């Protein structure tokens, strides 16, 4: 597993629990969407502008929705173009890139493309390489270049939401607390009179009958 402490120390932290899921397998995309919802996250809505851009990059029969299914025949260029388009979209706060063995591309090549895009953005990018030894090479490549990478969508999504909650907690710590307005005491004038009388007779602190007056008014 990717070192969570290193992930949280990164400046690639999400601004929201919304996530764009890019996959070459529609079924795996549905699994990722379900896991995201179960963990309290959301699929990022795709603007018309982003849909139009993706429509020019992807096969004509793509579903124009998130998860973004780039199809089983996706090559490295299609992966790269899709991730780049999502990172450039203002409504996207984070991207999960899923590679499955159905892909026509090499997992290491896909990993290299993701690494290049990750270095040019402050948005979080996470990778999932599913499959045997071949896919593991892609994961290792991502991890070696500080890109969080996992064997399953569920692991990646849990980490993404940890990252979001961590950022949110940091923001809350730095928020200026609102001023607490204390209600006026109903015995304010009594207290002022007792203090004034005490000072007039040369007393430097409340003693004796003055203390008793205050305690009686507060029911002590």
Residue ranges and their predicted role:
Residues 52, 104, 134:
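Flexible, glycine-rich phosphate/dinucleotide-binding loops
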Residues 2-23, 27-28, 33-43, 112-218:
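Peripheral docking tails and interdomain loops at the edges
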Residues 15-100:
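Short glycine-cluster motifs
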Residues 103-111:
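Glycine/threonine-rich flexible loop motifs
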